[in-house]
Amino acid sequence: MRVTNTSMSRIMMDSMANRTVEYAKLNEQLTSGKRVNKISDDPVASMQLVQLENSKSDVNQYKTNVVRLSGNYSVQEASLKSLEGQLLVVRDKLLAAKNGNHSATESATFGREINLLLDGMMSDLNTKNSEGNYLFAGTKTNIEPVEYNKTTQIYTFKGNNERRDAVVGNGITLQENTDLSSSLSASGNNLEILTNLKKLANKMIDSSIKPAAYNQEISDNLAAIEIGAKKIGGMLTDLGAKQNRLEHLSNLHDDVEVVNANLEKDLAGIDILQVNSAMQSNFLSTKIAHSMQAKISQLSLFNYI
């Protein structure tokens, strides 16, 4: 079969066009650092990369949640330790008031000191996180959970004991909040321990009331304090366990990120030296093709005589 100059020219032009497309593809790979830049480059790898991107996005969100939750736990832990410490100081004040023959003035001093400590405990119960949300209000994070009514001398809990959960891993959630108010309540979240301490402190301040009149109340409050302190201690232990869990999850997410990065490299990564070599080979082939095309276009019938 005779191949005409026109056919040969068309073949050469198609070959150069293909080389140009291939060169552009190689250049795009070199620029992006990726072998797969669009679905047509490798449909199977493209689908795997989409799934990988979803995995990376999930891991990033998990890591963000872990950091935020760990910060919240740290603030909660500090508040619990402060509350526990002040509660134990109140216990010491009551023990001192109960075990000695104190004057009305001395008892009043104990009462005022206890009131100051109660103010500090109320502040701990109304702790906010860095986002401005109340940590110990259950799901009512925008409402100050603890209020005190001076007229009735009663502490009231305005939050709830519902849990807030954070997703920190694939199918893994951890409770964000601590039901701290229950540690100072005889039942539910009535804050009875705080209320009874407040009423006792006010009696101690009132010089018209003899210490013997509230001696039994001191004993009752001491027993309640021991129960409350024990509950807070349990909550601190629970927070410590949660922090350890978060640390483990954080390390796990770091490992998954490394695995994802290696998978992405295997699926879409390039060998720069190999791509450069292919581009040079493509360039030389195209240059030779141009030269041949130029010579073919100059041929005439006289070249065949």
Question: What spans do the regions from the language model cover?
Answer:
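Amphipathic alpha-helical polymerization modules
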Residues: 1-141, 202-305
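Cysteine-poor, low-complexity segments in flexible/peripheral regions
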Residues: 140-210
